[in-house]
Amino acid sequence: MSALDRALTIEDLKRIARRRVPRQFFDYIDSGAYTEQTYNANEADFKKITFRQRVAVNLENRNLGSTLLGQPVSLPIAIAPVGSTGMTDADGEIKAARAAEKFGIPFTLSTMGICSIEDVAENTTKPFWFQLYVMKDRDFIYRLIDRAKAARCSALVLTMDLQILGQRHKDLRNGLSAPPKFTPRFVAEMAMKPGWAMRMLGTNRRTFRNIAGHVSDAVNLASLTEWTRTQFDLTLNWQDIAWIKKRFDGPVIVKGILDKDDAQLAIDNGADAIVVSNHGGRQLDGAPSSIRVLPEIVDAVGHKTEVLMDGGIRSGQDLLKALALGAKGALVGRIMAFGLGAGGEAGVARALEIVRKETDTSMALMGERDIRNIGLHNIYSNDLDRRQGY
């Protein structure tokens, strides 16, 4: 039995990934901004919610399937956009997209992915989602949207919480870059992770391929990175949703919502769905966890639009808790990344199967047969206050 087969939890996959992935790239997927208060709260706050156990219920013919943006999914989750996924494992975005497609859920490609829109489209058969950062160079954004449309992306995920980069101490200390800088420390680490190194040598996808072809004067990684750093648009506003949606001519999901007033503004300006998110705790440290603010946002706008969430989900039980609090579904990034680091495409598939099994078992023990019926009646009301968090 392989290490992947023996993995029973996402934490098991995380331990395997830590052994296989160079430190700077593992830390990138396993860290938050500043003191990591918000990053840690994302996970910890799920543990404050407890299930109601119901017994003597017919549990035959259970259903985990649902819909996201009107499309059927085998489980109400989607792979969240994660930058530099192709540094966790060679061609990582392609591998994750293939695993998601086989599992029957959407994959979201990041603007800051290593593999390009075209790379993923050429290696999959079903439409995927594309995550967009709004940058100052509007010609670049127009081209990205057009490329996503040409690749038949079925939704655009517009990230609103990165007008300025959060202070991420681990990334700064590690000198994070893609491709990595061959410092003596990094070369020494490669000697201990030969599998990762050999897989990277076997691909030419080792930089930000969505961007590289556009920046003609970026002659090396340093200039490409500097261009990106200066491009995040400080003037981003709610009215930008309209022209982005018009150009894409498809569903736009607004990501980065932590406040009910912002949720309403997103809907007022054309969002087809929203994602309650604090960027995985990698932007404003000290912001509340996503699960804490989810109930009040669902109360405010859940009857008007699909409310998704991300941040802190590490198990099927966490997914059920998010659904109980009113989320239509969840985006999972680190679940994918830990699986990818642990075993490439097979690792992502294993991660998704772990979540499926946890969801099915826990749902049954709660006395439910259909995931679409999960709601507040499945958790103890004294764990939270829907109006003020918990």
Positions of the model-derived regions?
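An N-cap/entry alpha-helix motif that binds or orients negatively charged groups
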Residues: 1-71, 179-236, 372-374, 380-390
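Glycine- and other small-residue-rich loops at beta-strand/loop junctions that grip anionic moieties
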Residues: 31, 85, 89, 109-110, ...
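Alpha/beta catalytic cores of nucleotide-metabolism and tRNA/nucleoside-modifying enzymes
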Residues: 1-50, 292-310, 314-390
